[in-house]
Amino acid sequence: MLLIKWQKNDTIQDTLPIDSTLIVQKNLRLLLEDYPVRLFFHNDIPNPRSWDTLTTLNYQITYDAYTRLQTDYKKEYPTSLPKKSRANAEVLVDSFFVHHVRKGYSDLEFFANLLYPYLEQGYSIKLTAKGFASPLARNDYNVNLSKRRISSFKNYLMELSDKNYTQYLNNTAPNGAQLIIQTLP
């Protein structure tokens, strides 16, 4: 899982009057403090069995592959449960994919569309992205996996065809705005 939140004590830096800045800060804080974006991944994705900290995959690619596995999960998950618990297993899998996996992707799309106009207006914004991995592997491996998941989120933003997030992530925007993603694996 990857959690994206507003960094509470950070400020948005800009050249607009202070009143406008406070309104923008409040709107973004409400959005990300109250509704953080939670992204879910299939086990050991992206780049399974890799010690790399970066990936070339973007989150949409990993999401699409994960959602295609929903039927497999519905078949396999019940077999791991006691017989009396199997009846609701398919419903639980469907519920997880609808209320967590798909919702996370929908929240990401909403977030990307909402955030971009603030950057276009010259606001610099700092986000915190924290990666999580199951405790099945060694801790140092999970840290690298979490970093790859954060990398897939950044790649998603940079590859959006209708927005140029790259200039804000690489600090090359003509208006001086930046999108800073602090990683907390």
Language-model region placement:
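Generic structural motif
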Residues: 4, 125, 179-183
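Periplasmic peptidoglycan-binding/anchoring modules of Gram-negative envelope and division proteins
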Residues: 22-23, 27, 47-130, 154-165
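Extracytoplasmic
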Residues: 34-38, 122-124, 178
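A generic structural signal for short, solvent-exposed coil/turn residues
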Residues: 31-33, 119-121, 173-175
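A broad, low-specificity signal for short, low-complexity segments enriched in glycine/proline
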Residues: 2-3, 87-91, 174
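Periplasmic OmpA-like peptidoglycan-binding domain that tethers envelope proteins to the cell wall
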Residues: 101-103, 132-185
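Pro/Ala/Gly-rich low-complexity, hydrophilic intrinsically disordered segments
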Residues: 1-50, 56-67
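Structural recognition of the beta-strand scaffold that forms the well-ordered cores
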Residues: 40, 126-131, 182
